[in-house]
Amino acid sequence: MSINSTLKREGITIINQLNTMEVNTIAANISEKLLKAFPEHNLNKSDLFISICRLNMYIADMPNDMAMAKYFYKNNSIYFSSDMNLEDLNTLAVHECLHYIQTKKNSHGKLLRLGIYNLETATNTGMALNEAAVQHMASIATNSKLDTVKYYNMELCTESPDFYPIQTALLNEMMYFTGSYPLYHSTLYSNDVFKNTFIAKSNIKTYNQIEKNFDLLFEYESKLSNEIYKLSISSEGSTNFNKIKRINSRIDDIKKIILEITLETQNTILVNCFNSELNSIRTLEDIKTFQTKLYNFKHLIISTYNYNFYNEFYSDMMNKLEEKREFILKFGNISAINSFRNELSFIEEKTFGFQFFKELLHKLKMLIEENLRAKEIEK
């Protein structure tokens, strides 16, 4: 299908193309922001600038149910909605240029991967998780601050209150366990570092479920946007109150589904990640660290009326920590074997540096010493 046919199908009508000076200004601004925001990821300002300058950028009429900007990989073009203001243009330009940077295609131009989103897998999931990652990074690059907002009867904290607020709030919860480096690296370089790191902090079933839930949230938010648009059209001088009532009912139902998926995802992150860390506790100091980490997680919690899951989980964990404390006081530190298995972090393939082998040898030494100590006790 040709680009013109694709644009027509998407409902995008070009108004005008940004000139070379306008594109160069955007490219200079974005390359500087990305370099400053993510200095540890080996980005080259000059290369970024030249690469972004190759993009075609357009102002266009966009459908109401579409995002305010869209990147098309087939013709390396970004289309900005004519309805957006200049402030949104700055953030969305970073967002769409990140999509451009993370694009991986084969020699025939077929799209293989966009950051976290791997199109070569059978499940073809991860699109929404990647969108959230890109939006999070765009917000960081434009110096957006954490803000507490309300959506669908939920109160949440995000640096992106206007674009993907729920997804970025949930992503912050995931990064609480992985740190930001794996996410940024996978988003920029299209690899599985973030995925493998999160799996190491939880399990593969948990990651897959979260990935699916992000896609579901994206799907239902699109449906919600469509229904809200229908309501705005129907409300303009309409006397068909039954139709308006039906649309409002569908809107309420979709909001409830979004709330349920969000809380289910949050609970999945909470339970599986902290249970994994609980199993890694070996010393009394580990218990203190775990307790502090569990307590501070409350600052990331997406809350709503009658949501008590975190408080109940916290209480349950405190009881389990007390059991761990009593065991350590009675028998000494817990074996390092399980901890070793959980703590070996996943790193990108073919990047086994000196530090990695140094840490590996250290952990192997710990295992050997632990086994020798166990044999001495048996004697």
Regions found by a protein language model. Give the residues of each.
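Non-Sec secretion/translocation targeting segments of pathogen effectors
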Residues: 1-5, 134, 346, 354, ...
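Pan-zinc metallopeptidase signature
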Residues: 8, 153-323, 327, 331-334
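Low-complexity, repetitive regions of proteins mediating host interaction that are extracellular
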Residues: 20-32, 39, 66, 123, ...
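Active-site recognition of the HExxH zinc-binding catalytic motif
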Residues: 91-107, 135, 139
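Nucleic-acid nuclease catalytic cores
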Residues: 97, 104-123
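Post-HExxH zinc-binding segment in Zn-dependent metallohydrolases
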Residues: 117-163
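Charge-dense, extended regions
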Residues: 333-342, 349
